[in-house]
């Protein structure tokens, strides 16, 4: 099962919906009903204690502000797109807009314009470096470095419809080297078609043009024609791509020229699996390749690659792991006609470092087996005895540092949540007693916060745990008269009245133990997941 290793970001601008426990698609009537429910509890005139009256006043103002924004069609649309920042900045939409559709269209136009401006303000660099190393050559004193290849490209948006990319390749071995410089100008002709002009100079000087058009909602066609400036040859390539399903696509490519070929390919990609394959017929023979990648956890994956053809036969096995937000490392083992290789890759953003290491040019079964088993065993040993303990220690250290930084903030939020729960207590108890009489839904225990801290609480470990807050009272308050409890998808639960964020920056869960028709049940949901109890069939 995949571990939760990072706090999900979730949809933006949902705090006011959480405050009133509303769905982002709530109707005007549902908004009014929720407002009345919360206002009856937190109205200051209903509170006798001076201390609690101050708490009630603060929460009542928050409820009124949420209702004022969500009940106003224009303000709600601005909030949904830009949040409180958009409202506080006094975003003007113009007096000519009166209908909801017009307002929404104008807001989306402004948002698109801002996104385009942001996109145009940034360059998009990509690059890769490949070092070819050879152990056999090193052992005979001939040096370990056998060659190097570098590729780099920078793309920039010139306007809404125009983009330019400038790049180059450089290759060198122990005796010779060379390079190619390339410039690409791309123009979006219409929403369904584009054209590119390509020019390169160096070892492969050429000029070319490529156009792409979306034929149907599921089909795309691309035609490319290029002329070599060195030998005058002309190459023509046609590619047809078809979306086969939501997660897979197929393509057929026909190339005419110096290297005429027909290629049929297939790709599939979903949340946990990525696969691709192609079959190629060319003048020099036949060839096929396949690649399968599976996500093993939220930060690691395994991969197998196979190639077979008239002059190729090899298989790759390996995997990779994300070591930071932007960096991934990968180790592959390759055995084939060219020999036995290890390949180490480092990916950071759009930059790649690839180091193939030739271990042996001969296919000795014992050596091939050892070359696979030794690094694999070493990896699992290091992972168990070095990497995991280190990562666990670092995770605890980060959690401790985060706790120290946010201690005061969390303490204040927890105090506000507990006072808000005190005001809910009377109504929550009354609702609970009503459910007891009808043998309905009764929340016996509800905890919100760090999943590990919740697990420790459930195992009977006592003591103050700052990673969790008890939310039994607000959960009983939110049980409807019909004996149902619903929290909406996409709404962060820390914004609900009587809740707070007990562990900022960490993933959170909501644990609920309840009885229904005198039968005990338990449920755990993520911070943005929907909760609906009792579940069907209970």
Curated annotation (Swiss-Prot):
One of its GO terms (cellular component) is membrane. Disulfide bonds: none annotated. The keyword ATP-binding does not apply. Residues 96-124 form a coiled coil. The keyword Transferase does not apply. The chain crosses the membrane at residues 354-374. Constitutively expressed in roots, stems, leaves and flowers. The modification N-acetylmethionine is found at residue 1. Plays a continuous role in plant development probably in the structural organization of compartments. Seems to be involved in resistance to oxidative stresses mediated by thiol-oxidizing agents such as diamide. This is Chaperone protein dnaJ 13. It comes from Arabidopsis thaliana.
């Amino acid at each position: 099962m995949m571990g939760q290793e990072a706090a999900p970001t979730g949809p933006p601008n949902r705090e006011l919906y959480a405050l009133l426990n509303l769905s982002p698609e709530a109707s005007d009537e549902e908004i009014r009903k929720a407002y009345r429910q919360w206002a009856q509890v937190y109205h200051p005139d209903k509170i006798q204690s001076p201390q609690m009256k101050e708490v009630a006043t603060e929460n009542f103002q928050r409820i009124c502000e949420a209702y004022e924004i969500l009940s106003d069609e224009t303000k709600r649309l601005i909030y949904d797109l830009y949040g409180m920042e958009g409202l506080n900045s006094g975003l003007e939409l113009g007096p000519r807009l009166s209908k909801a559709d017009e307002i929404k269209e104008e807001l989306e136009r402004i948002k698109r314009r801002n996104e385009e401006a942001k996109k145009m303000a940034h360059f998009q660099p990509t690059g890769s470096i490949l070092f070819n190393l050879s152990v056999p050559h090193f052992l005979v004193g001939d040096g370990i470095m056998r060659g190097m290849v570098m590729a780099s490209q920078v793309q920039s948006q010139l306007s809404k419809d125009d983009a330019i990319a400038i790049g180059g390749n450089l290759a060198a071995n122990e005796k010779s080297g060379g390079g190619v410089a390339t410039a690409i100008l791309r123009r979006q002709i219409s929403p369904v078609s584009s054209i590119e002009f390509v020019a390169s100079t160096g070892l492969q000087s050429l000029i070319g043009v490529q156009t792409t058009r979306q034929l149907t909602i599921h089909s795309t066609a691309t035609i490319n024609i290029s002329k070599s400036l060195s030998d005058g040859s002309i190459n023509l390539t046609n590619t047809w791509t078809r979306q086969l399903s939501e997660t897979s696509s197929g393509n057929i490519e026909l190339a005419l020229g110096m290297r005429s070929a027909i290629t049929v390919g297939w790709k599939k990609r979903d949340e946990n699996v990525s696969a691709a394959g192609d079959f190629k017929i060319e003048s020099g023979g036949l060839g096929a390749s396949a690649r399968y990648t599976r996500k093993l956890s939220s930060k690691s994956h395994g991969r197998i690659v196979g190639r077979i053809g008239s002059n190729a036969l090899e298989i790759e096995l390996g995997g990779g792991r994300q070591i930071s937000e932007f960096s991934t490392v990968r180790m592959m083992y390759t055995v084939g006609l060219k020999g036995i290789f290890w390949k180490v890759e480092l990916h950071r953003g759009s930059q790649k470092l690839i180091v193939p290491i030739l271990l042996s040019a001969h296919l000795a079964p014992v050596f091939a087996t050892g070359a696979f088993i030794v690094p694999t065993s070493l990896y699992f040993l290091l992972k168990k005895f070095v990497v995991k303990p280190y990562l666990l220690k670092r995770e605890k250290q980060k959690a401790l540092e985060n706790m120290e930084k946010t201690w005061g903030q969390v303490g204040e939020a927890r105090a506000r949540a507990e006072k808000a729960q005190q005001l809910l207590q009377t109504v929550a108890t009354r609702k609970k007693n009503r459910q007891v009489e009808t043998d309905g839904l009764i929340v016996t225990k509800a905890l919100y916060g760090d999943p590990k801290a919740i697990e420790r609480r459930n195992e009977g470990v006592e003591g103050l745990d700052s990673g969790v807050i008890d939310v039994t009272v607000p959960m009983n308050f939110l049980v409807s008269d019909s004996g149902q409890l619903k929290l909406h998808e996409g709404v962060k639960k820390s914004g609900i009245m009587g809740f707070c964020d007990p562990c900022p920056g960490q993933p959170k869960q909501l644990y609920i133990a309840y009885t229904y028709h005198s039968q005990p049940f338990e449920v755990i949901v993520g911070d943005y997941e929907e909760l609906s109890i009792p579940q069907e069939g209970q």
